[in-house]
């Protein structure tokens, strides 16, 4: 099929205008809408419209706001199907006029309303496609007629963590709630000011933050990363909870000193990073929760092999090698009191093939510890695993009273 440029596609739409209806019932011109993208107010020649209380934006203007080039490589139109295909930033999005869903990287995703192709040849797209395809934050305030399209929560978190490299608090001030921030790291006082102070104090400390994985589950964003301070390296997980306005209101984390490669040659942080199977998120979360409850907390070792594909298992724990056989030995040692025992699950987060479980356990010293286990699922079986274990200090040493796990949710 011959590809058309956006300009040519719109010209083709004009030819088809006799076959295309005008704005349908329930569609209202919305000339008073203010659109802000990444903090910049947009001046659209063609105003957005509102349909069934949902905002739709003209495709060309939305593409320009997002930095999507208006060329045939990035946007094409299929006249016969009345569909538009957008290729940008690792996402291929197909929108069909009259359809209340988008196809994103081959997966059907429901939208708040249907794409509209007007009699005048203008394609209006539901603004939530921006969130579904590119992870942008979308906030619509009907009272003020203001639409905000901004930095995704994932990007906010990465930007804040990278702030420790420079000591610049600008990102944290922008994205962390000034009055509602709850801190669960016992080494910091609660509230935003203590977090900002921590960033400021890192200036000139030779800090390097390397983010390896970022997953988002609803309002929660979890990051798996390596942090070096003056040459001393740690591996960590951070979890940030956002409110409906895109502000961070709660934070948990877990850190462990980096260890040498394990018996199979893996580090604590390397391995698979690509998120796949977004439609399997809940299924995979259920699988991993069942595994942890059954095998780790419940100590049902007989069920272990049913969660794996034979002996195919990539292990990033620094003490053990690949294979289910190696895991069996580790769990057997734990059963004899040589290692740790899982007591309680506090949180399960997932996105696609990755599932993060936050649990509480007993350390060899008899004190409590937190463990963050990250699993990668492939074809319904556990395929890869990372973890970070950190002992919880005595309450007398805490700088806040929020607890390591309090208010976590499953």
Predicted region positions:
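Primary recognition of N-terminal secretory signal peptides and signal-anchoring hydrophobic helices
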Residues: 2-152
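C-terminal and inter-domain tail/linker signature
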Residues: 150-410
């Amino acid at each position: 099929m011959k590809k058309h440029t956006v300009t040519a596609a719109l010209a083709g739409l004009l030819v088809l205008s006799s076959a295309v209806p005008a704005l349908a019932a329930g569609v209202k011109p919305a000339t008073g809408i203010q659109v802000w993208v990444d903090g910049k107010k947009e001046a659209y020649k063609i105003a957005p419209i509102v349909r069934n209380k949902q905002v739709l934006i003209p495709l060309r203007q939305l593409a320009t706001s997002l930095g999507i080039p208006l060329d045939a490589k990035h946007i094409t139109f299929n006249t016969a199907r009345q569909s538009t295909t957008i290729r940008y930033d690792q996402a291929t999005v197909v929108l069909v006029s009259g359809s209340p869903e988008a196809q994103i990287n081959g997966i059907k995703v429901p939208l708040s309303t249907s794409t509209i192709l007007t009699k005048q040849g203008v394609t209006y797209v539901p603004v939530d496609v921006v969130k579904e395809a590119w992870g942008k934050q979308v906030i619509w305030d009907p009272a003020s007629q203001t639409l905000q399209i901004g930095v995704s929560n994932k990007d906010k978190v990465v930007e804040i963590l990278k702030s420790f490299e420079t000591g610049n608090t600008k990102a944290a001030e922008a994205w962390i709630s000034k009055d509602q921030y709850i801190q669960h790291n016992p080494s910091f006082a609660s509230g935003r000011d203590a977090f900002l102070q921590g960033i400021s104090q890192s200036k000139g400390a030779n800090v390097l933050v390397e983010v390896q994985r970022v997953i988002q589950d609803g309002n929660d964003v979890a990051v798996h990363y390596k942090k070096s301070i003056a040459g001393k390296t740690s591996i960590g997980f951070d979890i940030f909870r956002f409110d409906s306005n895109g502000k961070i209101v709660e934070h948990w984390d877990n850190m462990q000193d980096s260890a040498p490669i394990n018996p199979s040659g893996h580090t604590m942080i390397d391995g698979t990073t690509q998120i796949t199977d977004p439609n399997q998120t809940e299924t995979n979360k259920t699988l991993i929760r069942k595994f942890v409850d059954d095998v780790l907390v419940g100590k049902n070792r007989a069920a272990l092999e049913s969660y794996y594909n034979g002996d195919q298992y990539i292990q990033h724990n620094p003490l053990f090698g690949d294979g289910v056989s190696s895991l069996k030995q580790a769990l057997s040692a734990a059963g004899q009191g040589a290692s740790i025992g899982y007591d309680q699950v506090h949180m399960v987060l997932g996105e696609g093939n990755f599932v993060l479980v936050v649990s509480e356990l007993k350390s060899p010293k008899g004190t409590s510890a937190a463990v963050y286990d990250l699993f990668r699922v492939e074809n319904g079986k556990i395929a890869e695993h990372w973890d970070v274990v950190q002992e919880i200090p005595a309450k007398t040493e805490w700088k806040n009273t929020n607890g390591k796990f309090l208010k976590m949710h499953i």
